[in-house]
Structure formats: structure tokens, C-alpha cells
Amino acid sequence: MKKVGVIGGGAWGTALALTARRAGRDVVLWAREPQVVDDINVRHVNSDFLPGIDLDPALRATVDLADAADADAVLLVSPAQHLRAAARALAPHWRAGVPAVICSKGIELSTCALMQDAIAAELPQAPIAVLSGPTFAIEVARGLPTAITLACAAPELGRKLVEALGTASFRPYLSDDLVGAQIGGAVKNVLAIACGIVEGRGLGDNARAALITRGLAEMTRLAMAKGGRPETLMGLSGLGDLILTASSTQSRNYSWASPWARAAPWPTSWASAIR
């Protein structure tokens, strides 16, 4: 795989584009914002979403979806609730057989569909893979050691994608359990918010440990009910992602919930927030 397209010019999309460049690929990054494209192409930074990181001058950004879709593999890094719309916009430009690598974590609110199902509906000609695991974009961009799950039903394609993205500091581990990888990446966000609440209310480390452990058990049961395998949830895209997101102040879900819970009156505002 010589050329990789990346759809999404946020922190994670930019970090993945930089990783693919380090792996020796030609990379075109699509961003919605013209100022982000200009920042990347002219100043070789993404000051809006990934400040403080110098980008490879050979990394090229564009506002043209067709340009980014003209690749040997395309990473879909738009926010989960907008991923279907992004795939629909890409469909006229997509060549049959080009893999779509889902790099966004979540479950579609309007349909309760996994990202895999949403993308398959819009890009039926695309083989699908999922990239998910314990990753903060800033650490990946800095080249700090990172391991991640790459799930793909086709073993040969999976190996090609691992080779296309893997570097000395970014290690994809191949799996064929797309469902398990997606459930882990989505549900850990809910548990991270819950752990932030535990921290904010001063309920202690015992409570957080219990929440992570029992949350993992529920996450595993959900994955199995959807056709995933329990061992996937014990790996990088399950337990690994959960530990990272539910215990670090770099986690947006955890860091949002903790101060909110500290300040919120109990219990009336909780019901309001849930609604």
C-alpha cells in the first residue's frame, strides 16, 4: 500500500496521518476547515487541533474528498455521529476494493448501529477494518510507544494494513473480531464518565476499581451478545482502552465528569444531566 487517505483533520486524524507518513506512505489528509488545510500545507502544523507538533512536510492536506479517496486505503476519522455522512459523501469517489479503516469510536445514536454497519450501508464496495485501542492522539503524534488493535475479517488485507501503518513506536495487533473491537471502543467512554464521577464525588479508589472491573464484565457480555469474542475485550481495544480512558486526566470524558461531579448538587442535577 503506497498511498493512504485520511478523512478528518482533528487531533486523531492528524496523528494517524503523521504515523502513516512515518511508516513510509504517501498521505493525503482531508479536513473540512480551509484554515487547517492551509496550516498543514504551508506551516506544517495543525495549530487548531494538535498544537505543538511539527508535521512531516510531505504530509499533504486537502479539502477535496476525491483527492483523499484516491488511495490504497482510507482511514475514516470523522466523529462517530458524523461518520455515516462522511462515508455517503465519499461514496461517489470510492474505488471498489479500497479498504475503509474505521478509526472513530461510538455507536450511532439515531440507529444504535455499530460504525461497521453504518459504513457498510454507505460503502458496500469497501472491505472494512477497525482501528481501536488505548491511544491519546498527542502521544501518538510525539512518537511515544503505542499498541492498538487492527481488526479485519480478511487476514491478508489485515496484514497489509498492519504493514502500512506500523512503525517502531506504533504497533497494530491484528484481530478478526470487528464487533468486539468496536464495542470496547464505544462502551469505555461511558465507563470513563462514570469513573470521573466517582473521582469527583470522592468515592475512593475502591469504588473506581469496582466500576472498571464490573464495567468490563458488562462490556464483555454486550460484545458477546452482538457476536464479539470475550478475549477481544481483554485486549487492547477493551481492557487497555478502558484503563487508559477511565484513569487519565488526558481523557476528555474522565476529565469532564470529575469536576462536574464535584460541583453538581446531589441528586437533582444528575437526573437532569442524564436526560
From Swiss-Prot:
Known catalytic reactions: sn-glycerol 3-phosphate + NAD(+) = dihydroxyacetone phosphate + NADH + H(+); sn-glycerol 3-phosphate + NADP(+) = dihydroxyacetone phosphate + NADPH + H(+)
Pathway(s) this gene product operates in, as recorded in its UniProt entry: Membrane lipid metabolism; glycerophospholipid metabolism
Residue sites binding sn-glycerol 3-phosphate per the record: K105, G133, T135, K188, D241, S251, R252, N253
UniProt xrefs under PROSITE patterns: NAD_G3PDH
Keywords: Cytoplasm, Lipid biosynthesis, Lipid metabolism, NAD, NADP, Nucleotide-binding, Oxidoreductase, Phospholipid biosynthesis, Phospholipid metabolism
Keyword Repeat: no
GO terms under biological process: carbohydrate metabolic process; glycerol-3-phosphate biosynthetic process; glycerol-3-phosphate catabolic process; glycerophospholipid metabolic process; phospholipid biosynthetic process
Binding site for NADPH: W12, R32, K105, A137, R252
Source organism superkingdom: Bacteria
Gene Ontology terms for molecular function: glycerol-3-phosphate dehydrogenase [NAD(P)+] activity; NAD binding
Cellular component annotations (GO), alphabetically ordered: cytosol
Annotated compartments: Cytoplasm
Residues at the catalytic site: K188 (proton acceptor)
A UniProt-annotated Pfam family: NAD_Gly3P_dh_C
InterPro entries attached to this UniProt entry: 6-PGluconate_DH-like_C_sf, 6PGD_dom2, G3P_DH_NAD-dep, G3P_DH_NAD-dep_C, G3P_DH_NAD-dep_N, NAD(P)-bd_dom_sf
Enzyme Commission number, as recorded: 1.1.1.94
NCBIfam families xrefs: PRK00094.1-2, PRK00094.1-4
Record's function text: Catalyzes the reduction of the glycolytic intermediate dihydroxyacetone phosphate (DHAP) to sn-glycerol 3-phosphate (G3P), the key precursor for phospholipid synthesis.
Family, per entry: Belongs to the NAD-dependent glycerol-3-phosphate dehydrogenase family.
Name of the protein in question: Glycerol-3-phosphate dehydrogenase [NAD(P)+]
Taxon lineage: Bacteria, Pseudomonadati, Pseudomonadota, Alphaproteobacteria, Rhodospirillales
Name of encoding gene: gpsA
